[in-house]
């Protein structure tokens, strides 16, 4: 879909080649983890307490919009605990045996990270309950009348689940997490620190004003700020002397069609469709998806959260409504 081509998409299949760079610039310690102060402070205490007791950290659920650092935080937790981390995702674990193979290969206090945990199948989820609660695995051996259940003891471990849809988790699964952390959109100042650190890791020349210009257009999302940094770097190397200042960043981002609010053509398309085609709303999600040629899930999970948080869009029981701020942004009269 169109969403996959967006430069400011928190999730995109078109930037897989840059994952290697992302891994290289990811922080490895809580001390280097910018923003999310409440999460960092709490996790520091929980990790130190678990280490003092020489126990596995309680199971941890991390939720929030895409691109905010859920995977990064999971890796930091494992690194701070001094244990191994095994990574998988909900859709990959199709059968109970897939999960059992991972669990039986864990060492004491290791971390098992499941991304998109809300997409686990009910069959796999049932196996996970006793593993989380009692560190035991219930396995069925054989078929028919000869089938029998055996219990396998597991070493203490920490399950870290990540999701963009905490509400989609079943209550039995959600209640088994001892620690629940919500990641919020980042402040511009925190993103400025992140982009300056990334520039340093990549060996780029960038001043604080250039970092601020990139940060304010990144929609509160670290993944986006790092992607914009790489595109601004390309512009600075080709059109300038390689140094990234505010003017260079502004020109590069304008060329990339990312405005001062962090909107790109998809954001403008969505808001303008509501204002011009549906008289400002309310408009239902099905009609809106058809009008802009995008999937409903993409609108709800990727496009809308930032627009709602910034006050440009309202999501009501009757449908979506463009706010006065949206009309003001586009210079359109109601």
UniProtKB/Swiss-Prot annotation:
The keyword Endoplasmic reticulum does not apply. Mg(2+) binds at residue 71. Residues 260-334 are annotated as: Head domain (RuvB-H). Residues 4-186 are annotated as: Large ATPase domain (RuvB-L). Pfam families: AAA_lid_4 (PF17864), RuvB_C (PF05491), RuvB_N (PF05496). Homohexamer. Forms an RuvA(8)-RuvB(12)-Holliday junction (HJ) complex. HJ DNA is sandwiched between 2 RuvA tetramers; dsDNA enters through RuvA and exits via RuvB. An RuvB hexamer assembles on each DNA strand where it exits the tetramer. Each RuvB hexamer is contacted by two RuvA subunits (via domain III) on 2 adjacent RuvB subunits; this complex drives branch migration. In the full resolvosome a probable DNA-RuvA(4)-RuvB(12)-RuvC(2) complex forms which resolves the HJ. This is Holliday junction branch migration complex subunit RuvB. It comes from Vibrio cholerae serotype O1 (strain ATCC 39541 / Classical Ogawa 395 / O395).
